Amino acid sequence: IDPGPNIKAHLNSILASVSLNQTITHILITHSHIDHSPLAKILQEKTNAPIYAFGDSFSGRSKMMVELTKKGDLKGGEGLDKDFSPDVYVKDGDQISNDEWCFDAIWTPGHLGNHLCYGLKKSGVLFSADHVMGWATSLVSPPDGDLTQFMDSLQKLLKFDDYNLYYPGHGDKIDNPKEIINYIIKHRKMREKQILKSIAEISLNSTQIAEKIYIDVNKSLIPAAARNVFAHLIDLKQRQLVTNSHELNFESIFSSI
């Protein structure tokens, strides 16, 4: 699952971990960011294993994001593996298996439109990739990231009782996944309230809002924080809780309604 970045030493480590009586038969990709998917093609050359994923890097975008991308510059595109494409396209609810194991594919767009989690059946284990991480909440940067989808996917994962141990793409294993998911939901709702409060009396853009509400982070992280804020603002716009100046893009000025 997720061979990682195109680094030769990393490839060698993967191949070295395969014992003489083992074979890599499938390459499963959770999503196509450059720290997860670029090594897949090189690993395939070594193993002849097919690559499984939801789709290319632009698959799974919501109708809203597709329309906004056509109308204006949303910026974004951080860390996207733009050349990625799978051999086998995986749909939500598909099962990927051989004689020894079976994975449930769970489509969880939000961090990226083509994001999948993989649940190893009868093990209690879910590979949650970057949707539920072990050390921080995920970056959601439009148009690749979509906060409406992200929140919906969190609610979706809460309904799965079979998986009580998550292995994320970053950070330690998570042995209390529902508690962590509920924390992420609560945290995002807290940010939403902060955003609405910050523009209740004055109109601001995403960066200005980030500077007001992310007071406890290093200033070098404000650009990333502003992308999260922008994702919230698009979600709030869809819910008719904010209005914006001119065409909706990253430079738009927002006011609460």
Question: Where are these predicted regions, by residue range?
Answer:
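Aromatic/hydrophobic pocket-lining residues that form the small-molecule binding cavity
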Residues: S37, F150, L154, V229
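Short hydrophobic beta-strand that contains or immediately precedes a catalytic carboxylate
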Residues: I1-D2
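Alpha-helical elements of Rossmann-like donor-binding domains used by nucleotide-donor carbohydrate transfer enzymes
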Residues: S13-A16, I42, Q149, K156, ...
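Histidine-centered divalent metal-coordination motifs
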Residues: T30-H36, H111, H170, H232
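Active-site HxH/HxHxD metal-binding segment of metal-dependent hydrolases
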Residues: P5-D99
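C-terminal regulatory/interaction regions
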Residues: Q194-I257
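Metallo-beta-lactamase
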Residues: P5-I7, L68, D87, Q95, ...
